[in-house]
Amino acid sequence: MRIRNNKLINFILEFSQIMLVFLGVYSALMCTASSLDMIYDGKLCLLLLFAASIVFYGLFTVLETFRKGKLYGLIGITMFFLALVIRFKGALLKGIVSAANSFLKEFMNYTGTNVSLLSYADTESASAKFCTTLLLILIGVYFVALISAFFYRRRRSVVFLAGTIPFVVLPLVAGRIGRYLYFFTYLVVAVTIIGTRHLRTDATDRRMRQKLALILMTTCLICGGIFYLFIPPSRYDRNVDKLSQAKNSLVALSTWDGEVIMTWLKAYF
């Protein structure tokens, strides 16, 4: 019975590490995709990124046992992805243009500026939804592979942060914040990974890191539950919308001249 319990505990600890990689990349990617109202298949992205997290966990835990195994593994994966980019360059180009235009529309709405949308000779028969989904999947799976290579035995939290933070921050440029679920999930994962970054050696420290990560993740989820009671999604969305309203008000005020300001002061004071 004790052996079975140990196996179960080991499975939970190892699986929690896979979930950290998966949820970290997926939530960061969805912060951009959902907040900018991109057209994509969310369920397919979730399924393939989760499958990729499991595959790369198995791959890199094996490659780590060989000299320069991770390096050769990353080179092989990069070459494979380059081949996919060449093979589906038409669909990917359409996906890039669609994603970029989604960002530009939100940016223009937020800043009140006029920017020309991207255009190109569309020879791709696939739908914009398929092309954007393909783009998100390739980006997500590649970052899952990259982060997995520096995560399980000797963790490099800087790789995770460098690969995911841009997707969380990008919507802010257009006055948007990732949707409630994705933004909160990313914060939980980021805090958990940063909190265990100093434990990098093998064996005992690795097991301690896994246990500490599980404790931190549980603590963050409890705090998130409390946060949910005080700031439910509806209130969160209202406050996010106020960012654009406040910014637009400031822009309007900056265009007032002295005469307009004096007229406004006389009217209200």
Regions found by a protein language model. Give the residues of each.
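Helix-boundary/low-complexity linker signature
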Residues: 1-269
